[in-house]
């Protein structure tokens, strides 16, 4: 029996666009799918014709050959036009296809279409102390897990799971058309290689259901915002027994009311009094391990930085510890009584005109004076 024109099979004209071909295929495949027409040989044959037409017409090279030579382009022994030299068999081409598909045209290693589970993301917020020292956190998330009722088979308990009659359990369909070989996911079983007699009532044949899962996550010392922890196999369950995906825990460190962080170093501002800045002394500064004493030299200016070695963050990679960097801020006294104000006035009078007591101010005034001098020239 002569093969029907591929365009006619899909109800299209020869100049149909790829979009038209895909639309027609989806409509007809849904209509004649074997699952909807069980036992109907006519529907099964029609479905095969539709699938074959779709595979040829959606491949640019095959479609061009078909438009020029018709079905003869895909017949063994054809010597039409551009296919001269391939008549009488495939010779070395069969070896090439064997390497590509793992065997000869009719066999080879066939594998089911397995889909690894999706990776999941979980965002977690921790304190700076937890980030620096490490901690354990219990988390709860919702994910697709193996169905307890069917144990991932997708079939109702007590019912059969048979090999798909269309791909014979391979999950993929391979066709030889002339010197072309095509391999695609079986449209009947969608790559599972199985035919489920009665789908599981819990998972509706998917083999997976949505479940809540509790996990304990160990967060190592030294992590920072944006770091990710990968928990292998804790993502969604895979399809048809495929491996589960992974879970990525994304770290977010809360802002601290005292410290800021830059890499392995911690920073803080330490207020000191006007008199201590001038006379020097000793103050207590906070660290994540407790308090420590810091010596303030005489004549300390606001903004001066003091580095405390090893009191920062331990790097999770190198093992070295960063530093704590304290920035001194000299506080201006407020809410002074008259006696205190008078003492400050006396101090101001005693310092007036003596540049060595105000080196920064003197330097600034000299710079301003020079600026206006040059501006007037």
Swiss-Prot record:
**Residue windows of the CXXCXGXG motif repeats:** 147-154, 164-171, 186-193, 200-207
MF GO annotations: ATP binding; heat shock protein binding; unfolded protein binding; zinc ion binding
Is Calcium tagged as a keyword?
no
Could you state one GO biological process linked to this protein? chaperone cofactor-dependent protein refolding
Instruction: Give the ZnF (CR-type) ranges.
Output: 134-212
- Main localisation, per the record? cytoplasm
For binding Zn(2+) 2, which residues are annotated in this chain's numbering?
A: 164, 167, 186, 189
Domain of life per record: Bacteria
Question: Which cofactor is recorded for it?
Answer: Zn(2+)
Give a short account of what the protein does: Participates actively in the response to hyperosmotic and heat shock by preventing the aggregation of stress-denatured proteins and by disaggregating proteins, also in an autonomous, DnaK-independent fashion. Unfolded proteins bind initially to DnaJ; upon interaction with the DnaJ-bound protein, DnaK hydrolyzes its bound ATP, resulting in the formation of a stable complex. GrpE releases ADP from DnaK; ATP binding to DnaK triggers the release of the substrate protein, thus completing the reaction cycle.
PANTHER family for this protein: CHAPERONE PROTEIN DNAJ, DNAJ HOMOLOG 1, MITOCHONDRIAL-RELATED
Q: Which family does it belong to?
A: Belongs to the DnaJ family.
In the record's own words, the domains note is: The J domain is necessary and sufficient to stimulate DnaK ATPase activity. Zinc center 1 plays an important role in the autonomous, DnaK-independent chaperone activity of DnaJ. Zinc center 2 is essential for interaction with DnaK and for DnaJ activity.
Name this polypeptide is given: Chaperone protein DnaJ
Which species is this UniProt entry from? Haemophilus ducreyi (strain 35000HP / ATCC 700724)
Gene that encodes it: dnaJ
